[in-house]
């Protein structure tokens, strides 16, 4: 869910339960605050776009190898997916994203958007399915 909220942004309705939780953390929301807005931080789309050229070259090479029979199509796709994952993780670490709000900085203890305990980066996975 965090990944989707960050990729596309979100307006999260503030519930009474959320207000109480934030109060325990020392954060008081104004009575007229009805949503918490998370800005768009497109790490997947922007990560792909940033490395599209090098990924296209890799894919050309892998397709050639698969056609020559030196690598299976499954292995070619596996290598391409692994490379894309590596580039997206790198983009998350280096990316220039909308800064965290003061509240988020206080809760996380830092201001590196998309990274707190590296859970998002560490949970990026891929699957190769052949039909």
Go through the PLM ranges and name each one.
Residues 1-131:
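Short, Lys/Arg-rich flexible segments
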